[in-house]
């Protein structure tokens, strides 16, 4: 294995640069996005090709595979050195990088981001490269920004997705109140308006993570959201309605009138509203919401 001393120097220089700037320099964004994709993007199956092009692609794929393995090992050992590491150590350099020697000598440098727009920049890069659902990426974000862990691994992209539950099963599982709210969901209202009647619905779906069947996310699309929220969380809902009414006097009247008369199938979705730090209410003109 080649010596890690020159590479180590570059890694800690990158750490110092991030720590001093307290953000990600603009001239590093493109490179960082590419390296994040190598570390966190799903593995692609090799495509069969002939000749020189196939050989070049095989070499590039082999480099990415080795780099991905080393990058993820660094993430596991010290998340705070991960970003400087992938900025300083290229996939080509990973081929001869002595990771065991580096980890033996490495001393944690602590956190490099304390407060700024770095978190938003990283989420932006992740979305650009379609890795924002990666469990490894989310672990990185939790560690370097001290975010709360997800309630379930099903929040990532590595999950089974189940659809088309039957209406009788939904009533049996959730009872009449939830069932009636689901029957008022935009999906059900639209289906009935088009004359489509079925015992199955897209208004309930489930995500089960690949690696665990002990937890899952069950999502319900409902109508009459404020009425249902008032049943489940009466005190909090009253505060939310009060705040919304102060912003728009028509909000409370519209949602409670729909709770009585039912939603207008001609209504179109409006934007969601976020209230303070404790309440997040997703409102539409047909009063649909999602409970997880």
From Swiss-Prot:
Keywords carried by this UniProt record: Cell adhesion, Nucleus, Virulence
Location of this chain's protein in the cell: Nucleus
Motif (Bipartite nuclear localization signal): 48-70
Example GO BP: cell adhesion
Entry annotated with the keyword Nucleus: yes
Region (RNA recognition motif (RRM)-like domain): 156-186
Effect of disrupting the coding gene: Impairs the formation of the hypoxia-typic morphotype and restores classical biofilm architecture.
GO (cellular component) term, any one: nucleus
Function: Hypoxia responsive morphology factor that modulates the expression of the subtelomeric hrmA-associated cluster (HAC) containing genes that alter the hyphal surface (such as reduced total chitin or increased beta-glucan exposure) and perturb inter-hyphal interactions within the developing biofilms, resulting in a loss of vertically aligned polarized growing filaments.
Domain notes: The N-terminal bipartite nuclear localization signalis required for nuclear localization and generation of the H-MORPH morphotype. The RNA recognition motif (RRM)-like domain is not required for nuclear localization but is necessary for induction of the expression of the HAC cluster genes such as cgnA.
Protein name listed in UniProt: Hypoxia responsive morphology factor A
Organism: Aspergillus fumigatus (strain ATCC MYA-4609 / CBS 101355 / FGSC A1100 / Af293) (Neosartorya fumigata)
